Amino acid sequence: MSEEHVHLDESEVYHIRKQKLAELRTSGFNFPNTFRREHLADALLKQYSETEKQTLEQKHVKVSVAGRIVLRRIMGKASFFHIQDVSGRIQVYLRSNDLPDVYEQFKHWDLGDIVGVQGELFKTNTGELTINAEHVELLTKSLRPLPDKFHGLADQELKYRKRYVDLIANEDSRKTFLIRSHLIKAFREFMDDNHFLEVETPMMHPIPGGALARPFVTHHNTLDMTMYLRIAPELYLKRLVVGGFERVYEINRNFRNEGISTRHNPEFTMLEFYQAYADYNDLMNFTEQLFHYLCDKVLATRQIEYQGQVIDFNKPFERLSVKEAILKYHPDIKAQQLETVEGCRTLLNDLDLPYKETDGLGKLQIILFEETVEHQLFQPTFITEYPTEISPLARRSDTNPEVTDRFEFFIAGREIANGFSELNDAEDQAERFRKQVEEKDAGDLEAMHFDSDYIEALEYGLPPTAGEGIGIDRLVMLFTNSQSIRDVILFPHLRQ
């Protein structure tokens, strides 16, 4: 029975294919692993698509390919079928006269089955590059049907839960994750070329730190101690700078026990790096160079279309302080209103934006910025002068101790990177940790713990240093024009 021409539900197809597999086992089929592929579909198409039909026949090009059957047309004593490998698709021509036994078996194979094919290249009368099969071998029997070839896997939730099916059915999904891989490779190339050392730091921490976030908690049975999945590698990377590794980076996962949205996944990938004898201005310049390199290397263009608008990486990236950004996008607000707690509270009340009575001036300014300005920063923009009270690891500004030498980098209305000149004064850092502990005791679940070992490391001396973290998932969203972070994570977190 050919299921392509009969409307069957998935359970019926599964039952029929199980029967086919049982019959195959009886005849000796055991999922063989002796076939060796020598060619990829895309490479063959690139090499021979422009070759004239007659010239190709004279060359007698022998090939060996393997992949999944994704399309087939059975026509009496001859059939065409397409196989799909990691690179693309190629057509195969199979004749009963050439391989009578295999042809009879082929008629009972199904879409989704994985086969190995050896044969000679030729072109059909319509000019399509095709393999004239001389050997065809079933390698894997597929028991479940592929999604409808015209509609693919349309259910978004199902795409995320069954990514393996999504990758089979949707070329766009495969392209997204290829771009992701190329992007991470380009990150590494740029960092290595700039003399940064790639390192690995712990994923389980005895004390959570490095960011303001709620951690995932676990327990180490042998040591009988509470451990935390890391929310950031920052404090360990800076320990390495203390130890003498002056340029370090890490690409790895962070975990934050927070909400899930189109921009947030509890498990996400970051590039984090630290450079001794540099400040946050150096890192902003470095970031511009990095993004130029990524655009050139991965997309071969510095203008990217995202959700119907063009992001231009060619122009110098705009730089605004938090206050300047608020005033730019709220021309009705007066600068002096941002200088007092009462003025900021009035602005937030007028906009019906919530805040805590204990929030200081800097926190109130940030609420106003995040809720009303951030989403408008579409072109690449650095926002600087973040308040000290929300930047416990950043160095204070020499000209205004109420703000820090810190920036956040925004594209398409979302934060892509966060960087600052590092606080290397052990006594100042200890005092800020103490204030964080007070906030935690007052109910702030995201406030930091006091990390005495990190303070001790600073007491040995951290050179003037700047550090930055870049969210790779969000950047992949931009580079692939994806609306949701789930579209760029192979196996995103979902409700059970």
UniProtKB/Swiss-Prot annotation:
InterPro entries: Aa-tRNA-synt_II, aa-tRNA-synth_II, aa-tRNA-synth_II/BPL/LPL, Lys-tRNA-ligase_II, Lys-tRNA-ligase_II_N, Lys-tRNA-synth_II_C, NA-bd_OB-fold, NA-bd_OB_tRNA
Subcellular location: Cytoplasm
Cofactor(s) it depends on: Mg(2+)
Cofactor note: Binds 3 Mg(2+) ions per subunit.
Broad EC category: ligase
GO biological process, one term: lysyl-tRNA aminoacylation
Family matches, as PROSITE patterns: AA_TRNA_LIGASE_II
Major localisation: cytoplasm
EC number: 6.1.1.6
UniProt catalytic activity: tRNA(Lys) + L-lysine + ATP = L-lysyl-tRNA(Lys) + AMP + diphosphate
Positions that bind Mg(2+) 2: 415
GO molecular function, one term: magnesium ion binding
Gene Ontology cellular-component annotations: cytosol
Keyword Ribonucleoprotein part of the UniProt annotation: no
SUPFAM superfamilies: Class II aaRS and biotin synthetases, Nucleic acid-binding proteins
Family: Belongs to the class-II aminoacyl-tRNA synthetase family.
PANTHER family given in the database record: LYSINE--TRNA LIGASE, CHLOROPLASTIC_MITOCHONDRIAL (PTHR42918:SF15), LYSYL-TRNA SYNTHETASE (PTHR42918)
Name of this chain's protein: Lysine--tRNA ligase
Organism: Legionella pneumophila (strain Lens)
